[in-house]
Amino acid sequence: MNNEWLNAYVLHRRPYRETSYIVDFFSLEEGRISAVAKGVKNSKSDKKSLLQPFQHLRLQLSGKSDLKNLRHVESVAPSISLTGTALFCAMYVNELTNRIMPQGLASDGVYSAYEAALLALRDEADIEVTLRQLEFALLDEMGLLPDFTSDVEYEMPIEENGRYHFQLDAGFIQIPDDVVGARGIPGTALLSLSQGEFTPLSKKVAKVLCRDLLKPLIGDKPLKSRELFMTKPR
C-alpha cells in the first residue's frame, strides 16, 4: 500500500494526541480505512484543509497495522457544497457508511452509491430516493437486501395484486386472500423496488424496510447525524 494512490472521501476525523487527527476514509480500492494525520491539528497546512468531508481525494498511506499513517493527500475535485437539509443528510450518509462498512472491505457498488448520493444531494435531487439508494447498496453489500421478486415461503413470483408480510430474517411471504383485514405490503410496491423505481407508494415501503433492516447493523448507539437533524431550527 505504500506506493498505491487511493481514491477516497473523509467520513470522520477526531483529535489524536496533541497535534494529530485520526481520519476515517472510505476508499474505492481498500474500502473503509483509518489513518493518523500527524502534526496537522494546529497547522494551517494544505493537508489539514483537505481533510474535510465531501471532497474527492487521492491519498497514500503507509503501515502494516489497521491504523495507517497518512503520507500524502491531494484534491481530485472541489469540495461538494452542501447546505441545510442536504448537509444533514450528507452527514447521515457519512455516519451510516462509517458505521456499517467493515474495515478494509472494498466495494465498487457502495463506493459508487456513496459518491452518487453526495452529488444528488448537491443537485437537490429527491432526498428520500437518494438515501434509500445508498441504504440499499449497503444492505446489498452486507447480504441483507431482500429479494423483491419472490415469495420466500411458496417460492413464487411476487404478484402485483398480492399483499405480503416481511420477515426480517427471511423475506416476503404472501398473505392469503382469505385473511380478513390484513394490510401487508402491496406487491406492486415490491415490484417497483425490484426495478429500482421509486413511486410514492414504494418510497414509503422502502423507508420502513430500510429502518428495520438497518437497525441490527447500526446497533443501539444512536446516529449523531439523526440527533442533529432533529434539533436543527425549523
UniProtKB/Swiss-Prot annotation:
Keywords (A to Z) from UniProt: DNA damage, DNA recombination, DNA repair
GO biological process: DNA recombination; double-strand break repair
One GO location term (cellular component): bacterial nucleoid
Annotated S-S bridges: none
SUPFAM superfamilies (alphabetical): ArfGap/RecO-like zinc finger, Nucleic acid-binding proteins
Signal peptide limits: none
rRNA-binding listed as a keyword: no
Similarity comment: Belongs to the RecO family.
HAMAP family xrefs: RecO
Protein role: Involved in DNA repair and RecF pathway recombination.
Protein name: DNA repair protein RecO
Source organism: Alteromonas mediterranea (strain DSM 17117 / CIP 110805 / LMG 28347 / Deep ecotype)
Taxonomy of the source species: Bacteria, Pseudomonadati, Pseudomonadota, Gammaproteobacteria, Alteromonadales
